[in-house]
Design a protein with these regions (language model features):
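Short active-site-adjacent structural elements
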Residues: 72
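P-loop NTPase motor domains
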Residues: 55-58, 75-248
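Glycine-rich phosphate-binding loop of nucleotide-binding enzymes
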Residues: 1-66
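Conserved phosphoryl-transfer catalytic core
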Residues: 69
Length: 248
């Protein structure tokens, strides 16, 4: 390692052929880093590989699946919303750029996971502008509220399905009919997600309380296996965005 090169964004990638010990290496790394005060957050465990490790450390994983009580809101603000009423304009804009940027990345991935035949649903500058305007209205950022309101993906879908005159104007559409015609694919994709892969899992405010002082916390996705790879992939996308928000 070169001491003259600062590490500002440390990441580790573990990859290899099946059965070569990737999971075992990761678990060993996790355990050893605990001696140095590091804690671990498993953002989606599709096969419950980390459950035995959690059990040894006295931690019960959060189980996410159809019919289970756990909900995760991928549009949660996280710590960046704390003390919003005390921020000056520059800091508020900087934090908003981070939060809305994270949400747009999430929704771009979710909408793009839906298909029309073999073609992914597009999420270009027009769709991004509509979604961003909708999120800003729902949270109160558009009106400069001192306390922002946490929203959800279903709430965004409902707003786009029944747009307010303000939203139509901000998105530069001639009329509500024009707005609805031009955003049909976007709205249908969000509607399909809301009633399908996200339903009962990522469609409401977060209902779990993470113990950040625990040595490890894990979110189990093994109950999603019968739903197929697409459902697991969407869940991992949502958890990645939520986890990023909790750490920002």
């Amino acid at each position: 390692l070169r001491d003259d090169v600062p590490v500002t964004n440390p990441n580790v990638i573990c990859f290899g052929k099946p059965g070569r010990g990737k999971s075992a290496t990761t678990k060993a790394f996790i355990l050893r880093m605990m001696d140095f005060g590091y804690r671990t957050l498993i953002l989606g465990d599709p096969k419950d590989e980390y459950e035995p490790l959690c059990t040894v450390l006295g931690v019960e994983p959060f189980r996410i699946g159809p019919g289970l009580p756990a909900r995760i809101n991928p549009l949660a603000f996280g710590p960046l919303a704390q003390g919003w009423e005390h921020l000056d304009a520059g800091e508020a804009q900087a934090r908003a750029a981070i939060v809305f940027g994270r949400w747009l990345t999430l929704l771009r991935g979710l909408v793009g996971s839906q298909r029309v035949g073999e073609t992914p649903v597009p999420f270009g500058p027009v769709e991004e502008n509509v979604v961003k305007a909708g999120l800003r209205l729902l949270t109160g950022y558009t009106h400069g509220n001192t306390h922002l309101v946490e929203t959800t993906i279903p709430a965004l879908w409902h707003l786009l399905n029944s747009p307010t005159p303000e939203l139509v104007e901000q998105c530069r559409y001639a009329s509500t009919r024009h707005f609805l015609d031009e955003t049909r694919l976007l709205r249908d994709a969000l509607g399909q997600l809301t009633s399908g892969a996200l339903a009962g899992l990522f469609d409401d405010h977060t209902s779990i309380t993470v113990d950040w002082s625990a040595p490890i916390q894990s979110l189990s996705l093994s109950r999603l296996e019968p739903l197929g790879d697409e459902a697991v992939g969407i869940a991992l996308t949502c958890l990645s965005s939520w986890g990023r928000g909790m750490r920002e």
